Swiss-Prot record:
The keyword Metal-binding applies. Homodimer. It comes from Pseudothermotoga lettingae (strain ATCC BAA-301 / DSM 14385 / NBRC 107922 / TMO). The gene is lysS. Binds 3 Mg(2+) ions per subunit. Mg(2+) 1 binds at E398, E405. Keywords: Aminoacyl-tRNA synthetase, ATP-binding, Cytoplasm, Ligase, Magnesium, Metal-binding, Nucleotide-binding, Protein biosynthesis. The keyword Glycoprotein does not apply. One of its GO terms (cellular component) is cytosol. Its EC number is 6.1.1.6. This is Lysine--tRNA ligase. It is found in: Cytoplasm. It catalyses: tRNA(Lys) + L-lysine + ATP = L-lysyl-tRNA(Lys) + AMP + diphosphate. Its cofactor is Mg(2+).
Amino acid sequence: MIKDILSQRAKEVEELRKLGVNPYPYKFEKTHTTKTIQEKFQALQPGEVLQDEEISTAGRVMTVRLHGKSCFFTIKDFYGRIQAYIRQNEISEEKYNLFKKYIAPGDIIGITGFPFKSRTGELTVYVKNFQLLSKSRRPLPEKWHGLKDKEVAYRQRYVDMIANDSTLERFRIRYEAIRFIRDFLNRLDFVEVETPVLNFIPGGGAAKPFITRLEALDCEMYLRIAPELHLKRYIVGGFEKVYEIGKNFRNEGISYKHSPEFTSIEIYQAYADYNDMMELTESLISELVLHLYGSYKLTYQGVELDFKPPWKRIKMREFIKSRLDVDILEDNDEKLYYVLKERGVEPDTKSREKMIEKLWDLVEEEVIQPTFLMDHPVDISPLAKRHRDDPRLTERFEPIIFGMEMGNAFSELNDPDDQLERFKAQLKLRDAGDEEAHRMDLDFIRALEYGLPPTGGLGIGIDRLIMLLTNSPSIRDVIAFPLVSQTEEDDLEGSAVE
């Protein structure tokens, strides 16, 4: 019973204090990680000992194997695991008995000793001294074989990380990828900037916003759905290359590829267009894959994906027409609606914009390899510049990989008159019941009136990108603390929380 275990461990904490042992000390001098130990001493031969090489490391005890007056145990830190060996004859009977009685899987300890290779060839730390650094009050799940219940893993990600090395590795890759993206853009002289998360007008994307209230000004505010309009204000103000990595919020559904709270990167470059942003996208992502895996190829859900540039380009109008026999520019609304109904799709509204988006949804999953979907109609692209060869289209693209939209990019609309008319068209959609339609932002129009240079803009969903990079089937697998429904915490019975 969990209550009995919690009670026993609480008792052990009190016993340690009575023995003069602080179960939660302040500091430990760590000279090596498990990774540096492995790198420096892996070449040792079985049975070889380096008594003069003192090392101090620390981590969580994962396994303990007692053998009378000696013990093998494994500790885990952020970088991996290392075996350790402790003997009564080395550290004194009193301290060895303390280890035997009070050190258990889950505890965090520091050890000092020297490296050797066991007869079976496993690199091991011979412990000359140890210190308890944090006494675990809860047992590791399922005797350390890992946390297998997905919902529990999402709610208690800290336990998931402890129990499953693959989870820790997944998030290590996530933050290594984000670091690479920053370094890549910084080398190209992009400047990382910040924009507000609280907005008076939720702009920059077609989505239903979260609403909050600012008591100081007695007014409603919105969590941002995208930083786009503020980033373009930076370009108006004189910045030429900017990016922001941050959280966005959309009060919409949850699915394997949708989270109401998600991370994106948005990038804007003055004097560039969507062709430049395509080159930037395929260069950034392909070099990221190469950096992580040493190859442009990786396997996602059993399918090999090849990220080597140049990626394939397809045009939205032609692709939909080839698959569904409908022309999203020439055919009337009735034809679009008929094609959707014929395939069992009921649009939320009969607006042309929504029907075009639903038609694309029908064929998106056919696009597996890294591909740029290009030249969307003006109807569904209110912030993109009209196409230089066909004003019914826009200079817009979306990178599509494994049937998922990974981002969105434009030659940015910088004509204030055209932008004002697009906002007005969006207002009509809102009046007709479309909660996701863009709102009027007159200050943004004013910014454009001061002059936005020709600009290329790009947004990439970081979470979906990490799904691909870590072969994760759900977006919740790559968000450390995803949104999950709340439950009663009955398992806190018997703990300090009670």
